[in-house]
């Protein structure tokens, strides 16, 4: 219950308007500010960390099986975006503690792979062709953790331009992953390391470098 003139903080970025209206209607005082729980949730405890490591190990096994299957079957040009996404899900389902996908799989070949947050449907479903780049962005919910992995795969020979761009992205990834930095450094301060190889040839990377991943809670 809200007592008269009780001061209650709400985060306007996440709280439903109903709460603000209810507080005011009950003669409470609304104080706007960031939700203090958000920063606490961003730090995993030791149980969540251990679960995340184990979940990623199992997910990595499923993805390694998928990569082998993809390399063997994609050049036949008989696969389509839905079939490939379903096959990866099957490999994950065969592992332990799998609950569901963590989000709808982004499965895009050729031009579809360049569409941000593309969602394949029966109308847009495209067959994979030799020379295509195929993007798969997917993840799983395991009882002990959550995964999210994105990979760009070549069907046959992707050509010199694709190899060059892929190599530049890899250089940026290695530079960022191996950089030593002092405590307190923010992601935005070292983000340029990932982008520099593309910037050097006048290209802009329009995507974010990385993001956090939650833990499955049921």
Give the label of every model feature segment.
Residues 1-218:
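Active-site neighborhoods and metal-handling regions in enzymes and metal-associated proteins
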């Amino acid at each position: 219950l809200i007592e008269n003139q009780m001061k209650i903080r709400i985060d306007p970025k996440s709280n439903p308007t109903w709460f603000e209206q209810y507080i005011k209607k009950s003669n409470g005082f609304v104080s706007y500010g960031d939700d203090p729980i958000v920063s606490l949730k961003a730090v995993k405890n030791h149980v969540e960390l251990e679960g995340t490591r184990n979940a990623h190990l199992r997910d990595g096994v499923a993805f390694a099986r998928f990569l082998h299957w993809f390399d063997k079957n994609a050049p036949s040009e008989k696969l389509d975006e839905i079939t490939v996404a379903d096959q990866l899900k099957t490999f994950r389902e065969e592992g332990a503690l799998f609950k569901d996908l963590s989000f709808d799989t982004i499965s895009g070949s050729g031009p579809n792979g360049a569409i941000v947050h593309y969602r394949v449907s029966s109308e847009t479903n495209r067959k994979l062709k030799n020379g295509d780049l195929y993007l798969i962005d997917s993840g799983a919910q395991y009882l002990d953790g959550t995964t999210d992995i994105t990979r760009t795969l070549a069907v046959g020979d992707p050509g010199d331009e694709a190899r060059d761009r892929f190599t530049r992205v890899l250089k940026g990834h290695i530079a960022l992953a191996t950089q030593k930095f002092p405590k307190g450094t923010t992601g935005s301060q070292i983000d340029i390391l990932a982008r520099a190889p593309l910037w050097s040839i006048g290209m802009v990377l329009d995507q974010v470098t990385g993001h956090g991943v939650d833990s499955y809670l049921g």
